[in-house]
Amino acid sequence: MSNEKIIEMIKEMSVLELNDLVKAIEEEFGVTAAAPVAVAGAAGGEGAAAEKTEFDVELVSAGSSKIKVVKAVKEATGLGLKDAKDLVDNAPKVVKEAVSKDEAEELKAKLEEAGATVEVK
């Protein structure tokens, strides 16, 4: 029996007959026709197994080259000089939130090049 013939037979069935067919297939093969339900994992727990798409870049410390780090933060965030300096002075602080992995890695590299200690979370 070809797939086309099976499909034609299914087209001719009523809703009740289709429901019975689905139940029979589920019992025969030990499967379910229910759609899989996505369950959100607990924060910081089981959700870590799923690949993250958004990352936070956190400045842990400015290191010895504070002026270079302030300039790098100012350039990366668009903050004014005073705001960038305040962020660096109050480390550990999140520099950018919810950015792509590529953007997070790029920012981390720039800040580390300036002498900062950075974490991507």
UniProtKB/Swiss-Prot annotation:
Keywords: Ribonucleoprotein, Ribosomal protein. Signal peptide: none annotated. The keyword Transferase does not apply. GO terms for cellular component: cytosolic large ribosomal subunit. The keyword Cytoplasm does not apply. HAMAP family: Ribosomal_bL12. Forms part of the ribosomal stalk which helps the ribosome interact with GTP-bound translation factors. Is thus essential for accurate translation. Homodimer. Part of the ribosomal stalk of the 50S ribosomal subunit. Forms a multimeric L10(L12)X complex, where L10 forms an elongated spine to which 2 to 4 L12 dimers bind in a sequential fashion. Binds GTP-bound translation factors. This is Large ribosomal subunit protein bL12. The lineage of its organism: Bacteria, Bacillati, Bacillota, Bacilli, Bacillales. The gene is rplL.
